Amino acid sequence: TSPVAFLTKPARWMQLLGSHRWGLTAAPNFAFDLAAARTADADMAGADLGNVLAIMSGAERVQPGTVDRFAKRFAPFNLSDSVIRPSYGLAEATLYVATRLPGAAPTVIPFDAEKLSQGVAERGSVGTPLISYGAPTSPAVRIVDPESRREVAAGRIGEIWTRGDNVCRGYWNKPDETAEAFRGGWFHSGDLVREDPDGFFYVVDRKK
């Protein structure tokens, strides 16, 4: 199906997944919202999502509420929330930096909103919910204080830097932008994240 066909009738996406075995698909966050809101039970007649291998969410910030609504909407059609994989990628890194491994539902943790505004991501019983993108598996990733340019300790907020064979060398005919973003052999993403001691990270904000 084409992007236009999906926008015209978002149910087509789930219909295709439900009519084939071993489905694997990826889409941005807004597509999950559209599919959940505009797919009727009648659209899913005879569909079975029990054999879906993975549904990756990327290309824009993954919203915990969207993932929850999507999982609940299609649970009656045997969709397991463990196949939903929040993913973090960059065009500059050939789209892929990290994704949550399959086998468990996406992890959503509340963080103290006041502490987040101070540059500290501290877990709390209530607060701003952030979703885990898993552990980075791009060739090389650092979480760095953008001012000191030193790696931050677990639990602190820093900018994600990456480098490797999958990372481009710069922007075509844009020397100023290239000089700003590609420094010291690393691509500076502009995304601020919090990394757990186990290596899993949560996107907090944008620096640029």
PLM regions with names:
Residues T1, A27, G58, R163:
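Small/polar loops that bind or transfer phosphate-bearing groups
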Residues T1-L17:
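ATP-dependent adenylate-forming carboxylate-activation enzymes
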Residues P10-A11, N29-F30, E60, D165:
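Alpha-helix N-cap/helix-start capping motif
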Residues P10-A11, P64-D68, W172-P175, F200:
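Conserved strand-to-helix beginnings and helix N-cap segments that scaffold or border functional pockets
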Residues L17, W22-A26, R38-T128, A140, ...:
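Gly/Ser/Thr-rich phosphate-binding loop
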Residues I131-G155, E159-K208:
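Conserved ATP-binding/catalytic segment of the ANL
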